């Protein structure tokens, strides 16, 4: 019997519509898609890199994983927020299960992949890696071999939300080149039965250059010298993918997947500004004044005390009056709202009998927020218990997709209105969309359009090959 091999190529943040638009400039990808089982891949709720790739690898949804974004509450305290790592994924990944079966596996840059996990084969950590001084390969001694291939091996594009577009673009190409150089080295020199690789540079490209590409973007700039940044990069990426496919034999089963899509970002809505204005979040005025010794902006906010209305600040626990606060929020791709529940939070004030009515009232108010011109937004407010059969960890009480993720959530305060034109972490052109890409091909595959594939189904489909 022929040896069963599976190669999974992950492209972060690629929507099906993008590959369709670029069809003429990406011949290798187009050829693959036109001879495969292909369709949209519904992402997790929320559609964020972490937890989406972990769900793909384990078959477990964010509720089962206890991972609701890049930062997660680890305890009842107000400051118990921790960046996700591979240690947080307790469910076995497909490479864990295959390692247990004696299969040789290679995993490269699949988030959350730091610190590296022991496998029967090789594991190279992802963009969460702090730097070369840290252990980022398994086995550890492979690090020396990797650095001989790429002495300045990159894990990510640093500070990709910045006006430094030329620097970002240069680093995107460097990152991609180094990743594929490593992948090709593995394919040529190491034994494997299962290989999974994720390219994060596509996500960074979209965040930095989407407005130059997407004519529907509210800040579309077709005259910019970066107007071809996205199609040019995908032509380059396609050439590397073509070289990768040449290193695979015809008996290899190939998956092409993305964890979520991308779309134009229209701006940001201040979740904590909203909660303050509605009386749900109360700040300590004296502590607030102490925290205003920071770089000022030219903004004015009714949420800040008189004489200090020219600053944007983060809402840290020490400036919140918890004895008067019923809810607070965290910004990001989506808004996370936590209720200050008595008996759960250290200084909770919302009684059990008030908890559900407050959630419903907040949902009603959040869904009623219009855009800056008074137009209705398609805001979705989800309760974790409505979307996850099992809940572990500490999820938000409300998950808010402003205008179905056309707007980001802004956690900082100090703006003249609820609406901001830029992400509060830096210039950003795109937010995430729900559908990524799914394509599957083996020696028997006939071209087939598929609908309804969900990201948690991928791990089982991989295991079925063996």
Q: Where are the predicted features?
A:
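Histidine-centered active-site/metal-ligand motif
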Residues: 203-207, 216-218, 260, 427-432
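A structural signal for well-ordered alpha-helical segments within the folded catalytic domains
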Residues: 27, 51, 89-96, 177, ...
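Low-complexity, glycine/alanine/valine/leucine- and proline-rich hydrophobic stretches
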Residues: 402-448, 455
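A long, amphipathic alpha-helix that forms part
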Residues: 169-191, 195, 205, 211-255, ...
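Secreted, luminal/periplasmic, and some membrane-associated catalytic domains
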Residues: 2, 11, 70-101, 108, ...
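Beta-strand elements within well-structured catalytic alpha/beta cores of enzymes
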Residues: 3-19, 32, 56, 98, ...
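Active-site-proximal alpha/beta segments of enzymes that process anionic O-linked groups
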Residues: 3, 16-190, 200-207, 300, ...
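C-terminal accessory region downstream of the catalytic core in glycan-modifying enzymes
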Residues: 32-37, 110-112, 348-373, 433-466
């Amino acid at each position: 019997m022929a040896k069963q091999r599976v190669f999974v190529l992950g492209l972060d943040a690629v929507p099906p519509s993008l590959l369709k638009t670029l069809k003429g400039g990406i011949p290798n990808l187009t050829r693959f898609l036109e001879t495969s089982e292909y369709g949209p891949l519904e992402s997790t709720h929320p559609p964020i890199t972490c937890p989406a790739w972990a769900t793909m690898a384990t078959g477990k949804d964010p509720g089962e994983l206890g991972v609701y974004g890049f930062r997660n509450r680890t305890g009842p305290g107000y400051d118990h927020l921790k960046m996700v790592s591979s240690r947080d994924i307790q469910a076995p990944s497909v490479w864990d299960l295959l390692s247990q079966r004696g299969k040789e596996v290679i995993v490269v840059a699949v988030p959350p992949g730091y610190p590296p996990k022991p496998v029967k084969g090789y594991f190279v950590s992802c963009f969460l890696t702090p730097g070369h001084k840290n252990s980022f390969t398994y086995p550890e001694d492979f690090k020396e071999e990797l650095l001989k291939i790429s002495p300045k091996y990159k894990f990510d594009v640093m500070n990709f939300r910045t006006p430094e577009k030329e620097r970002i673009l240069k680093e995107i190409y460097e990152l991609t080149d180094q990743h594929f150089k490593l992948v090709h080295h593995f394919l040529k020199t190491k034994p494997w039965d299962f290989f999974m690789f994720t390219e994060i540079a596509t996500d960074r490209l979209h965040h930095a250059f989407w407005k130059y590409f997407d004519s529907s973007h509210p800040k579309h700039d077709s005259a910019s010298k970066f107007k071809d940044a996205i199609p040019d990069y995908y032509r380059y990426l396609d050439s590397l993918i073509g070289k990768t496919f040449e290193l695979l034999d015809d008996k290899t089963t190939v998956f092409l997947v993305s964890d979520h899509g991308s779309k134009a970002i229209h701006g940001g809505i201040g979740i904590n500004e909203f909660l303050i204005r509605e009386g749900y979040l109360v700040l300590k005025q004296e502590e607030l004044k102490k925290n205003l010794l920071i770089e000022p902006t030219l903004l004015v906010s009714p949420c800040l005390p008189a004489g200090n209305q020219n600053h944007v600040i983060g809402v840290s626990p020490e400036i919140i009056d918890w004895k008067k606060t019923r809810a607070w929020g965290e910004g990001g791709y989506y808004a996370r709202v936590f209720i200050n529940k008595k008996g759960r939070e250290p200084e909770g004030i919302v009684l059990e009998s008030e908890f559900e009515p407050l959630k419903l009232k907040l949902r009603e108010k959040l869904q009623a927020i219009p855009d800056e011109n008074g137009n209705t937004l398609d805001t979705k407010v989800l309760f974790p218990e409505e979307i996850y059969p099992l809940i572990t960890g500490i999820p938000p009480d409300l998950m808010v997709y402003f205008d179905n993720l056309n707007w980001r959530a802004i956690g900082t305060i100090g703006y003249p209105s609820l609406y901001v034109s830029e992400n509060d972490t830096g210039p950003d052109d795109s937010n995430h969309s729900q559908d990524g890409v799914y394509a599957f091909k083996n020696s028997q595959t006939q071209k087939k359009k598929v609908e309804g594939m969900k990201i948690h189904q991928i791990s089982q489909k991989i295991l079925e090959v063996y």
